[in-house]
Design a protein with these regions (language model features):
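Class I S-adenosyl-L-methionine-dependent methyltransferase catalytic core
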Residues: 1-243
Length: 243
């Protein structure tokens, strides 16, 4: 991939908003049976920041997932410190401190702390004790990179909130690879020629959430925001689910 393309990709990442967990839970409950035995890919999702990763990690056993894969950048600007790369085998301290792209692959989430529940502490334990659970990526972690495309090919279902400015390109890749997906996009995407064509051809549809209900997203510190809830800055965005 050309340097100019990589630069554009990094710039486009700044338009990403982080979905709140209750919104993910409310939509995913309609698809529970479809996740059993499946490999789920969250390929725009740093677990430090992403509630998509958090949802599927917390519900790994409940949903009966076979595998959960997330590709992302180390470090966090939103949900700092819930998972810590320091001490993870194969990750140098310099990589843990920098925004080094990496892949997390989860195939088992036991109750490691014996408290009867699955929580992020269990996932953190997995990352620090299973050498094949986390590996650094060769590229920048962009969903269009060769290694990330290969991961999408291997996945059964893709679930994420891609950058809105790259929505057309993201959906085009999903359709080209004939992937099942549940993603979030701007409501205006319905009017895009390419997206409207996919909707008309039954290649995708909107989700269960009422289209009249907009969504509130967590935003980084440098963004304008409308209110603070639970210590997080949130902003009202015209968005909906696509599947």
């Amino acid at each position: 991939m050309a340097t100019s393309t990589l630069t554009k990709a990094r710039q486009n990442k700044t338009d990403e908003f982080y979905t709140q967990l209750p919104d993910i839970e409310a939509e995913m409950r309609h698809y529970r049976d479809q996740f059993k035995g499946k490999s789920v890919l969250c390929n725009c999702d740093d677990p430090f920041e992403s509630n998509f990763f958090k949802y599927f990690a917390l519900n790994f056993n409940f949903l009966g997932l076979r595998k959960l894969v997330a590709t992302c950048y180390a470090g966090s600007s939103v949900m700092q410190g819930e998972l810590d790369l320091f001490g993870v085998p194969g990750v140098a301290e310099s990589d843990a401190r920098a925004k080094t792209p990496y892949k997390i692959e989860i195939t088992e989430v036991p109750d490691a702390n014996a408290d009867g529940a699955t929580d992020l502490a269990d996932v953190a334990h997995l990352l620090k004790n299973r050498r094949n659970a986390l590996s650094l990526l060769n590229g920048d972690g962009d969903f269009r990179s060769r290694e990330c495309v290969e991961l999408m090919k291997q996945a059964d279902i893709v679930a994420t909130n891609p950058p809105f400015s790259l929505f057309r390109e993201y959906v085009a890749q999903l359709i080209a690879l004939d992937k099942k997906f549940i993603i979030i996009g701007n409501k205006n995407a319905i009017t895009y020629r390419e997206i409207f064509s996919h909707l008309a051809n039954n290649q995708m549809r909107t989700g269960y959430r009422n289209l009249n209900d907009d969504m509130w997203f967590i935003v980084p510190d440098q963004y304008d925001y409308e209110k603070i809830e639970s210590g997080k800055r949130i902003k009202h965005i015209m968005a909906c689910w696509f599947t």
